[in-house]
Amino acid sequence: MGSVCVRLWAYLQPFLPCWSQEADKSVVIENPGAFCPPEAPRSQEPERSHGQYFVALFDYQARTAEDLSFRAGDKLQVLDTSHEGWWLARHLEKKGTGLGQQLQGYIPSNYVAEDRSLQAEPWFFGAIKRADAEKQLLYSENQTGAFLIRESESQKGDFSLSVLDEGVVKHYRIRRLDEGGFFLTRRKVFSTLNEFVNYYTTTSDGLCVKLEKPCLKIQVPTPFDLSYKTADQWEIDRNSIQLLKRLGSGQFGEVWEGLWNNTTPVAVKTLKPGSMDPNDFLREAQIMKSLRHPKLIQLYAVCTLEDPIYIITELMRHGSLQEYLQNDGGSKIHLIQQVDMAAQVASGMAYLESQNYIHRDLAARNVLVGEHNIYKVADFGLARVFKVDNEDIYESKHEIKLPVKWTAPEAIRTNKFSIKSDVWSFGILLYEIITYGKMPYSGMTGAQVIQMLSQNYRLPQPSNCPQQFYSIMLECWNVEPKQRPTFETLHWKLEDYFETDCSYSDTNNFIN
């Protein structure tokens, strides 16, 4: 009997690793949320013939017992990619332990890239715009020689090199030969981008400056969900939410900084009882949760089983754009920052446009501000389910109430919304941005605004507003909805607002 037990224990031990931890109490598991590792690796480990190998692009701290913590640069073996947002992965040779341990758990899929791929290189930033490349390189943490490589906006298959030189970002086209190879000038061709980078980190050879360190990746992506468990089951226990600090209040309820599961900072919108029908909200929220874009606030979860209803989203620490603009008043925010705000909002709205989704209440109060000058559109779709009461709200014969000063004339008349009525609202948002959060149609009631709009009145050009910026506003306020620009067009107009024809350095500079 004893020999049978010994053989049975030998068989079960690798599968019951947590039972054998008494052997070495000095071992500290860095991530308490990961699965406990075996005391000793099995003979077939690390099973490098199974799964795909990835590199972490950012740090991630486990949020639940099923998650896996890791740091940028760590190597991970992905075991299951069946869920879009969360993959099951194993940590290979966890740094700092020296024990070759392998820990297992779920990871956000947008935090990793396949090992030895271009996306895994710290200097590769993918399909970002030229303006975004400049903004990221100009962060104070970057020094002269900081650089990144991105996909070319105009030449498919080509790349662009962006370099910081004494506070100025310069761009170079990296061209590709049909037979393979990359070059700035044909006198020096490289078989891979890695060779290209290695060469120009040793010599400038015609560049404005020798390449030094890759641009810091400060803009960390938002996980699609709170955790793997809430990805599909997103009605969560309200006891898992702590309300820490009230950030603001309005006609619908309050907004709080909160903490989920004692691990994850979140924003919590607590709604006044009766402000919406829970069933209507859940139908809309199901769609809202599926909308994923870097410039949209991510809806994480809800608590609807009792009042007050909780809406849990990602946290943006600087509050609404309206308050952010009003508090600054022009002290630090100038035209270049204002155009950037508008471009980021247009980017998020262009995504909604591509998904045939209408916001219905686009305004500075519904744009939120995060770290590193990040702006995201919030509360998209909620106007359809809120029941509101305000003197500047127009109530149609269908008992739907509208924020008149931001609403397109045709939507006021017919109560029919479209992406083109959102474009009108975007024009009002541009007015808010350029005036540092002033109320549009100041001094007018909602009824007076309706009367003035019927006579083709438009907000006048603010004193500090450039003609180019005001022209974009007027395009948004075209009386014919079909004549208003798309958000895609508005996005590129604002992205290229300061651009000239000489945005790329001449490759003749490389010819000796």
UniProtKB/Swiss-Prot annotation:
Alphabetically ordered keywords of this record: ATP-binding, Cytoplasm, Kinase, Nucleotide-binding, Nucleus, Phosphoprotein, SH2 domain, SH3 domain, Transferase, Tumor suppressor, Tyrosine-protein kinase
Effect of deleting the gene: Mice are viable and do not show any histological abnormalities in epithelial tissues or develop any pathological and/or metabolic disorders associated with the failure of epithelial organs.
Single Gene Ontology BP annotation: negative regulation of transcription by RNA polymerase II
Record-listed Phosphothreonine modification sites: 185
Domain Protein kinase: 241-498
Domain of life the protein comes from: Eukaryota
Main location: cytoplasm
Annotated ranges, domain SH3: 49-117
Active site (record annotation): 361
Residue span, SH2 domain: 123-215
Enzyme Commission no: 2.7.10.2
Residue numbers bearing the Phosphotyrosine modification: 394
Subcellular location, record wording: Cytoplasm; Nucleus
GO CC terms: cytosol; nucleoplasm
InterPro entries reported in the protein's UniProt record: Kinase-like_dom_sf, Non-receptor_tyrosine_kinases, Prot_kinase_dom, Protein_kinase_ATP_BS, Ser-Thr/Tyr_kinase_cat_dom, SH2, SH2_dom_sf, SH2_Frk
GO molecular function annotation: ATP binding; non-membrane spanning protein tyrosine kinase activity
Family that this chain belongs to: Belongs to the protein kinase superfamily. Tyr protein kinase family. SRC subfamily.
Self-association state and partner proteins as the record states: Interacts (via the SH3-domain) with PTEN. Interacts with RB1.
Function: Non-receptor tyrosine-protein kinase that negatively regulates cell proliferation. Positively regulates PTEN protein stability through phosphorylation of PTEN on 'Tyr-336', which in turn prevents its ubiquitination and degradation, possibly by reducing its binding to NEDD4. May function as a tumor suppressor.
Protein name: Tyrosine-protein kinase FRK
Species this protein is from: Mus musculus
Lineage start: Eukaryota, Metazoa, Chordata, Craniata, Vertebrata
